[in-house]
Amino acid sequence: MTKLILTRHGQSIWNAENRFTGWVDVDLSDKGIEEAEKSGQIIKDLNIKIDISYTSYLKRAIKTLTSILKKNDLELKFNTAWQLNERHYGSLTGLNKEETKKKIGEDQFKKYRRSWDIAPPPMEEKSEYQTLFSPLNASIPIGMLPFTESLKDTYDRVVPFYENEIKKNLIDNKNVLISAHGNSLRALCKYLFNISDTKINELEIPTGNPLVIEFENNLVINKYYYLDKTRAKDVIFNQ
C-alpha cells in the first residue's frame, strides 16, 4: 500500500520562544534535533520504506529531513521546493504570540493565526526579518514572493505542487516523505481530507511526529496515523 509520510520539522528556536516564524530561516532547537532523530528512528523501527523525499527551502525542514534519511541509511538526495515553505506571517513575523494576542486582542489574533482567508498586514521591505530577496529565494519569480499570506494563499501554492510533482510518485506506488511546516502541511491535509474552511482552524500539526497516510488504488485514502502514539492526539480529518 502506497504511503505518504508528512512530518513537520522538529521544534525550531523560534517555536521554543513562541514567535511567529514564517519564512525566516531559523534553526532547530536542541529539542527539535532530538525530535528529528526520533522521527527517523521510528520510521526505521517500523521498516517504512522511503522512495523519494521533498522539503522546503528552509533549514529547519531540511535538517529534519536529512536527519531522517541518515537514520534510515539513505542517500541524502531530496527535492527542495519553495512551495512547501511555511506560511508567510507578514508583519507578525518575529513577534511573540502571547504578547501579540494581548496587544491586538484574542479575536483578531485568532483571525490572523487560524482563519482560512485572512492574512496579517504585509511585512515592510525594510523589516529586519525581510528575507524575500536573500540568495535563498533567488530562484523564486519576483511576482510570487509573498509579503503576507493567509492559509488559503499557502494552499494555493502547496496544492498545485502536490498535484503536479508529488502525486505522480504516489501513482507509481512510490512512498513519499515530505518534511515541511505546520501551515503548509495543514493546507495539504485540508486538500487531501476535504476539510471545510471553518473546521481547518482546529487542525494542529505537531512538530517532529510523522503522519502516515496509506492509499489504496486510485489514491483513495485507506487509513492515517501518527507514528509516535505517545504524542499524538486522535486524528479526525473527515470534517
Spans of model-derived segments:
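Short coil-to-beta-strand
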Residues: 2-11
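Active-site-adjacent alpha-helix immediately C-terminal to a catalytic or transition-state-stabilizing loop
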Residues: 4, 62, 70-72, 145-148, ...
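Active-site glycine-centered loops adjacent to acidic/histidine catalytic or metal-binding residues
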Residues: 9, 83, 181
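Loop-to-helix element that buttresses phosphate recognition and phosphoryl-transfer chemistry
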Residues: 11-67, 71, 79, 145-160, ...
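Phosphate-coordination/substrate-recognition cap region in phosphate-metabolizing enzymes
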Residues: 40-129, 139, 190-212, 238
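Alpha-helix-centered segments that form part of catalytic cores
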Residues: 117, 122-161
